[in-house]
UniProtKB/Swiss-Prot annotation:
Protein name (database record): ATP phosphoribosyltransferase
GO biological process, one term: L-histidine biosynthetic process
GO cellular component: cytoplasm
Enzyme class: transferase
Organism of origin: Bacillus cereus (strain ATCC 14579 / DSM 31 / CCUG 7414 / JCM 2152 / NBRC 15305 / NCIMB 9373 / NCTC 2599 / NRRL B-3711)
Free-text domain note: Lacks the C-terminal regulatory region which is replaced by HisZ.
Amino acid sequence: MRNIQIALTKGRLEKHVIPLFEQIGIDCSELKNKGRKLVFQSKNTNVSFILVKAVDVATYVEHGVADIGIVGKDILMENEKDIYEMLDLGVGICKFCVASIPTYNPKSYRKKRIATKYPHITSTYFHDKGEDVEIIKIEGSVEIAPLLGLADAIVDIVETGKTLQENGLIVFEEMYFISARMIVNKAALKTKKDEIFSIINMMEQEILSGK
């Protein structure tokens, strides 16, 4: 059996997907007790894991460093990569929203300024609506932008809405629902077809049985 390398991202998504891998028989004990390590070998299978930043998962898969990647749909929507999107894992579910202070008027004809970490997704959404907006890209916390007058509204990922509420913002539009996806390197799907599809099929069955 050829080794399969899987790229994961640290944090919330990692905690969601580790149980899925364990349920299909892939040992994740090293991954759960990782310390500062970034590369891990499953003890009972031909699978190894690498931990990288969320925005880099698809890059590692695209360039063949990883055969499989687990990444949020938001990353795939914002950054076009030459990979196969194989499976919706049904975890890490949240949504893209337009949010602002309560006095914001989404129906105003004035050109709006929208602050976001996701300029491509945001521009596409408003273009499809026929609205001309100015996109202001922000890397940090976007919630502050409407409060300080930098932007009329923000586009961001919302899970519980608690952060918005704490900053006095409300949701005006729900744009897209997103979740964790399994992606695969195109060349690896040919050279390691049996190994990759074995993981995909077991994962799919586990997801369906859990619904």
